[in-house]
Amino acid sequence: MTDLQIAVDPTTDVEALILDWAGTVVDFGSFAPTSIFVEAFARAYDFPVTLDEARQPMGLGKWDHIAALGRLPSVDARWQARFGHPMSHAEVDHLYHTFMPLQIAAVTRFADPIPGVLPVLDALRGQGMKIGSCSGYPRPVMETLVPAAADHGYRPDHWVATDDLKAGGRPGPWMALANVIELGVNAVHRCIKVDDAVPGISEGLNAGMWTVGLSVSGNEFGATWEAFAAMSEAEIAARRAPAEAKLRAAGAHYVIDTLADIAPVIADINRRLAAGERP
């Protein structure tokens, strides 16, 4: 356990973290969903999409992600040239049903925690912090990922899948708020929503929470841990800058490299809460 101490006032300070999964706690670079989108398009329609295209709608529920991917100008132009019409609802359904078994089969390979994250979460939990979570993955994928992550030591207090709630998923606030209810958090302004993608930042803002974007560990940076570790400081800075800019433009209150860097943010938010500030 890391030696992390944050003075905590249980009546006023941050009470809960609401964490995304891929690119936030597990799967450095968020490769499990993106690589499978590419494979699903190839299998279902022998249609190529690039990894960069697959990353652009990241954070949405996976059916919505496929539909948004089909609306990207580059994908839509190629689709219409190939098939003579925009991607239809039925075609999105077919892609989704192709995607799901591939994702379920692959997700356990991407359950490794992001380096440095678990010791920080253990230390925070030891000080009374509640750990909630939600994902753009549907429940069948989460039912495979959650026990795999537990085998690696990550066990949040609660998790919500993108298809669990009648109201829907991101960018709406509902998954984050379902965590608030389940965890018994006393006020949404005492929660921090942490995510590596824009829809997750919007989710936190819509829920009335503080939001923290992750500029290196997730979708926007888009590198494996091994590739990141081999980069020079200049290379890291060049890739971090647009990721940080995108997350800040989405409204993130803070942007850090990875969840392992969250402690100073919590301390600063506690200071702001004590001064009467709200998200």
Swiss-Prot record:
Cofactor detail note: Binds 1 Mg(2+) ion per subunit.
Cofactor: Mg(2+)
Residues annotated as catalytic: 20, 62
EC assignment: 3.11.1.1
Organismal lineage: Bacteria, Pseudomonadati, Pseudomonadota, Gammaproteobacteria, Aeromonadales
Native source species: Aeromonas hydrophila subsp. hydrophila (strain ATCC 7966 / DSM 30187 / BCRC 13018 / CCUG 14551 / JCM 1027 / KCTC 2358 / NCIMB 9240 / NCTC 8049)
One Gene Ontology term of the molecular function aspect: magnesium ion binding
Top-rank taxon, per record: Bacteria
InterPro entries in the record: HAD-like_hydrolase_sf (IPR050155), HAD-like_sf (IPR036412), HAD-SF_hydro_IA (IPR006439), HAD_sf (IPR023214), PGP-like_dom2 (IPR023198), Phosphonoacetald_hydro (IPR006323)
Gene Ontology terms: biological process: DNA repair; organic phosphonate catabolic process
Protein known as: Phosphonoacetaldehyde hydrolase
One term under GO cellular component: cytosol
Keywords on record: Hydrolase, Magnesium, Metal-binding, Schiff base
Family that this chain belongs to: Belongs to the HAD-like hydrolase superfamily. PhnX family.
Function: Involved in phosphonate degradation.
Subunit structure: Homodimer.
Catalytic activity: phosphonoacetaldehyde + H2O = acetaldehyde + phosphate + H(+)
Disulfide pairings: none
